[in-house]
């Protein structure tokens, strides 16, 4: 029989065992068992920690990475060898050293995870950026993170500032760096990198303003991987106690870009767990369904609109998606109605809901296991080692002290800007972004609530709600609607459908029909673009 894990320690005095709330300090504490982290004083990179978790006996032949479009795969032995070889080129030929920032600008191609791990393994700082950004946006990002070199896809290189040294991925120069050359010295087996040193600089979403550069430490990434390793051991232990085999390593489809915190962390997790990542250069719903079927994908990280599409489009039912076991939801709130509709159509797929920020190195809270996943509308419980405060309405940002001061208070608390609450069992519920609340005649209207209602209508494929300026009311809730194919739903029907389900002040007052809702790569609605579109359309055309 497998050894039983020790029970989690009792909560400190004054902390409620169900919710984790301390009435004296008004702080919510994680009720999860603390993870098994290496000593903080031990020099270690995130890459070294990830590789230390791998079991060599199960790796040969298993793909680490697969290109969804071509089917080209890289096995774990080949992946590890490629990382070591490239790390040697970066150290010996390019002269990169710990703390040097390297901008990585490329779509989700097989070379990118190899490059990311090679950079982290020598203590260099990975700074992944969106390959479809403009030259002005790259100039802003470069001014913040100050990279000594940029690695760019051929189609992107010309958009980068001229003063930044650029190595084109796939070029002869890059090939020489990546080549295994017995005459070239290897990178040091262990570099003098503290866990508190910066491992990555990620750029936060620009949905409410100019992007900010967020510093993520090796310790941040190690804690994330440790959490997943602990969960894997728990699942294996429970399977052994039940006389069952533990589940095989996941095959994860990654339609989320690797420059986003969600995609970046998912690849890190996948490698540390010895799993397979199937990469998509850009999200396409039909292509994603084909990839799930072709590669027998078991895990899909996605934003809520993907669930809506899977429920509403017949193509999802025509495909063999029987391998799919888990969908990890992030990027935006998931409404109860959408979750329940999905569960009725795909009863064997577990929905793991989570919540995180770039500034928090990803996950803050998540559901764990089938029972917690039934808490529809919640993003789960606080992760190990985390605390939170609900207040009345990090390492910091790189090169932007003003933004850091506005986001991290004097006691070190990260202000997330979310309207949220905990229930008596410690489940966290995200209502909406404070900055996105619509102010109608003094009332606060959460657009996400109205979007969930609209998306439940069978004639609506997608929806977004924005504030429309009004002299009398201040702001009016305005809905942008994408009709389902064959649907002829009218503006009046849209407004009536919502009005029957909300208080009078939450009614949708304006409606516009569009072919698509603009979204960030992580699936967040780009409300600023819709506001500009609404103003340019003019009242007479609405």
From Swiss-Prot:
InterPro entries xrefs: AMP-bd_C (IPR025110), AMP-bd_C_sf (IPR045851), AMP-binding_CS (IPR020845), AMP-dep_synth/lig_dom (IPR000873), ANL_N_sf (IPR042099)
Gene Ontology biological-process annotations: phenylpropanoid metabolic process
Family: Belongs to the ATP-dependent AMP-binding enzyme family.
Enzyme Commission number, as recorded: 6.2.1.12
Annotated domain remarks: Both substrate-binding domains (SBD1 and SBD2) are involved in the substrate recognition, and are sufficient to confer the substrate specificity.
TM regions (residue ranges): none
Protein's gene: 4CLL5
Reaction(s) the record says it catalyses: (E)-4-coumarate + ATP + CoA = (E)-4-coumaroyl-CoA + AMP + diphosphate; (E)-4-coumarate + ATP + H(+) = (E)-4-coumaroyl-AMP + diphosphate; (E)-4-coumaroyl-AMP + CoA = (E)-4-coumaroyl-CoA + AMP + H(+)
Keywords, alphabetical: ATP-binding, Ligase, Magnesium, Nucleotide-binding
CDD domains: 4CL
Binding-site list for (E)-4-coumaroyl-AMP: 262, 331, 353-354, 358, 435, 439
Name by which UniProt lists this protein: 4-coumarate--CoA ligase-like 5
Region (SBD2): 354-397
Top enzyme class: ligase
Functional summary from the UniProt entry: Carboxylate--CoA ligase that may use 4-coumarate as substrate. Follows a two-step reaction mechanism, wherein the carboxylate substrate first undergoes adenylation by ATP, followed by a thioesterification in the presence of CoA to yield the final CoA thioester.
Region (SBD1): 284-353
GO molecular function, one term: trans-cinnamate-CoA ligase activity
Residues engaged in binding ATP: 204-208, 212, 353-354, 358, 418, 433, 524
Coiled-coil features, chain-numbered ranges: none
Naturally occurring in which organism (per UniProt): Oryza sativa subsp. japonica
Cofactor(s) required for function per UniProt: Mg(2+)
